[in-house]
């Protein structure tokens, strides 16, 4: 995955096309392009079909997806902060397809709870709650009247709590990888 997102010219072209839709403010076109053109993975494991009870082999990884940041610069800064976080220790962190978000693949202990599905789900919830609590996702946009309230959708994407949730890949030549866990 790291090699694909850091060096694929095809993915670079697809990502640029998807990001242009975002920059033009066309959410409908952005979503369509993302879903129809970008490759994706299911970080939680390999599934026999798209249903959470079809998890024959968990990967030991979960994904935390942070969306709707105010700028690409903010996304780059958060990518580094998440990667350097001593509790999360992501094995991979990269900028999302929109350019205004971050995806982090976070390892967890496969043996903590015997029930694989429950163990994975609890780790997903822990990671999402931790990231939301530790990192400030209040909008810093100057036009926002109440900067303490998050009305922008900015922050952890909670729809990613489903084990079979697809994680769309995007080109990021500055993606961060941890080769030793």
Positions of PLM-derived features:
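Conserved hydrophobic/aromatic beta-strand scaffold that supports enzyme active sites
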Residues: 61-63, 105, 166-168
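Catalytic "initiation/cleavage/transfer" segments centered on a nucleophilic residue
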Residues: 6, 10, 110-112, 135-181
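Contiguous ligand/interfacial binding patches
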Residues: 128, 132-136
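Signature for HUH/AEP ssDNA processing cores
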Residues: 1-100, 108-125, 151-154
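Short Gly/Ser/Thr- and Asp/Glu-enriched loop/turn motifs at secondary-structure junctions
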Residues: 95-102, 161-166
């Amino acid at each position: 995955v790291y090699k694909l997102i850091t060096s694929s010219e095809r993915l670079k072209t697809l990502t640029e096309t998807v990001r242009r839709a975002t920059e033009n403010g066309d959410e409908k076109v952005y979503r369509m392009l993302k879903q129809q053109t970008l490759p994706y993975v299911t970080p939680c494991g390999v599934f026999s079909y798209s249903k959470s009870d079809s998890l024959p082999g968990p990967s030991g990884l979960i994904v935390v997806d942070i969306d709707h940041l105010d700028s690409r610069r903010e996304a780059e800064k958060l990518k580094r902060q998440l990667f350097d976080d001593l509790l999360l220790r992501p094995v991979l962190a990269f900028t999302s397809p929109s350019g205004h978000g971050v995806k982090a693949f976070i390892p967890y202990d496969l043996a903590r709870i015997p029930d694989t599905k429950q163990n994975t789900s609890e780790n997903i919830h822990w990671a999402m709650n931790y990231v939301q609590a530790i990192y400030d996702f209040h909008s810093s946009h100057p036009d926002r009247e109440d900067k303490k309230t998050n009305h922008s959708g900015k922050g952890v994407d909670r729809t990613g709590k489903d084990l079979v949730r697809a994680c769309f890949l995007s080109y990021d030549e500055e993606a961060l990888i941890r080769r030793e866990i």
